[in-house]
Regions:
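Active-site glycine-rich loop that binds ribose-phosphate moieties when present
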Residues: 103, 120-129
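Active-site metal-binding motif and surrounding structural segment of the metallo-beta-lactamase
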Residues: 10-56
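Short, conserved loop/helix-junction motifs that constitute active-site signature segments
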Residues: 22-25, 46-50, 72, 134-137, ...
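Metallo-beta-lactamase
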Residues: 58-108, 112-115
Length: 184
């Protein structure tokens, strides 16, 4: 079993895992998509408390360390992964897919175990045929649908934040997420 990101409190993660009959200590690792705080809030806590390996690209690891974003952790718990290079955890094959987002080296994850497959793709600013191809044939897809463009534009966010969200390295709108799903 793996976690993808740890952007909520460690207590909430533990409670959620307990609800489905899993223990945090039994996790085989944490797959990190990118270094933004809403994806790594409890990464350091879980790594320290349970000795969980943290799988991330070198760019993401460097950004986490540069910001001291997760506190002091045992360096040996970091596992460098490379976009487009599959790796395994137990009997699960994991394929990191590079994504367009305003982070150091963000990825999505496609996971394959036995005859089952799942993709988790969050914080995506745009998609192209490469992304569409990677999502084909999955049994389960978790895809971000971040905002309604008109509501965002009319909302109270500062102009620069709106531009960031709407940009190619921001977040997919609900409409664009729907269009992507229609191609899968």
């Amino acid at each position: 079993h793996v976690l993808v990101d740890a952007g909520i409190s460690g207590k909430r993660i533990e409670a959620g895992l307990n609800e489905i009959g899993l223990k945090t200590a039994e996790m085989d690792g944490i797959l990190v998509t990118h270094e933004h705080s809403d994806h790594i809030k409890s990464l350091g806590v879980l790594a320290r408390k349970y000795g969980l390996p943290m799988y991330a690209t070198q760019g993401t690891i460097d950004a986490i360390k540069e910001k001291s974003a997760i506190g002091k952790v045992d360096e040996s718990l970091f596992r460098v992964i490379h976009p487009e290079e599959d790796f395994t955890i137990g009997d699960m094959r994991i394929s990191p897919v590079p994504t367009s987002h305003d982070a150091a080296e963000p990825v999505a994850y496609m996971m394959y175990q036995g005859d089952k497959s799942m993709g988790i793709i969050t914080d995506l600013g745009k998609y192209d045929n490469y992304i569409v191809d990677k999502l084909q044939g999955l049994d389960v897809l978790l895809l971000e649908a971040n905002h309604d463009v008109h509501m965002l534009q009319a909302g109270t966010y500062p102009y620069q934040l709106k531009r960031r969200i709407l940009g190619d390295r921001g977040h997919l709108s609900n409409d664009l997420s729907g269009q992507l799903l229609g191609k899968v």
